[in-house]
Regions:
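Bacterial N-terminal signal peptides that target proteins for export
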Residues: 1-14
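Extracytoplasmic copper-binding redox domains, predominantly the cupredoxin/blue-copper superfamily
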Residues: 27-230
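C-terminal segment of classical bacterial N-terminal signal peptides
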Residues: 18-27
Length: 230
């Protein structure tokens, strides 16, 4: 009996020690900061220099419509895998388009695909991160899909080949879709040097390095360039 009691005591002590280590590794409020910034999309345009007969066209930059900024996701690229809470998001099928075309969710989240059109749609994906086929369903119906792995999932309609959307799935909470002005906020980011990425569904991504410190938000801005048309 004494031997059994000692074993129980040893196991209990080990469990308490392990719990203490786990608690100690959880970041406190003092170990967290935030990242704020703005995303713009620069479109190359051609402008005339001067009014001379010999004036030549020169490249310039204009900003894309604000609606395009809703197709951007900003995230901490080197973020550690972290326990996350599943979300519920929605991509509607409207006028033979996915609305919105881009959503960002945590692992385990469900994305619903309501059909607002007076025709059938068939949502599917062949992405490695998540392969699925929701089958055909009519107006007024909705079908959902759980996304259980991190990564990029390209979504299409099997009936209308011009329809496409993207689901970005993260195993950490440090990501955001900018608002219509391009502004974003990433709260609760661990302190230190990080790689911050701005991703656009068609323009790809760009990454900058940023140090997050306590006491004040770290700020960063992105301008995503659109390739010039020949």
């Amino acid at each position: 009996m004494i031997s059994g009691a000692r074993s129980t005591t040893v196991l209990l002590a080990a469990a308490v020690a392990a719990l203490a280590v786990l608690i100690d590794t959880e970041p406190s409020a003092q170990d967290l900061g935030s990242v704020r910034g703005r995303v713009s999309i620069g479109i190359p345009v051609t402008a005339k220099r001067g009014t001379s007969t010999y004036s030549r066209s020169v490249p310039n930059m204009a900003l894309a419509p604000e609606s395009e900024l809703r197709h951007v996701v900003v995230y901490v690229k080197d973020a550690p895998k972290t326990a996350v809470t599943p979300m519920r998001a929605e991509i509607r099928q409207r006028n033979e388009n996915f609305v919105p075309r881009v959503v960002a969710v945590t692992v385990g989240s469900t994305v619903d695909f309501p059909n607002d059109d007076p025709i059938y749609h068939n949502v599917f994906s062949l992405s490695r991160t998540k392969t699925f086929d929701l089958g055909r369903f009519p107006q007024g119906k909705s079908r959902g899909q759980v996304f259980d792995k991190p990564g990029v999932v390209k979504v299409f309609c099997q009936i209308h080949s011009h329809m496409s959307a993207t689901v970005m799935v993260f195993d950490h909470p440090w990501f955001a879709v900018p608002d219509e002005s391009g502004t974003f906020d990433l709260p609760g980011v661990p302190l230190g040097l990080h790689q911050i990425t701005a991703w656009h569904e068609r323009l790809g991504d760009t990454t900058q390095q940023l140090r997050v410190e306590t006491g004040r938000p770290a700020t960063i801005d992105f301008v995503l360039p659109v390739p010039a048309q020949p």
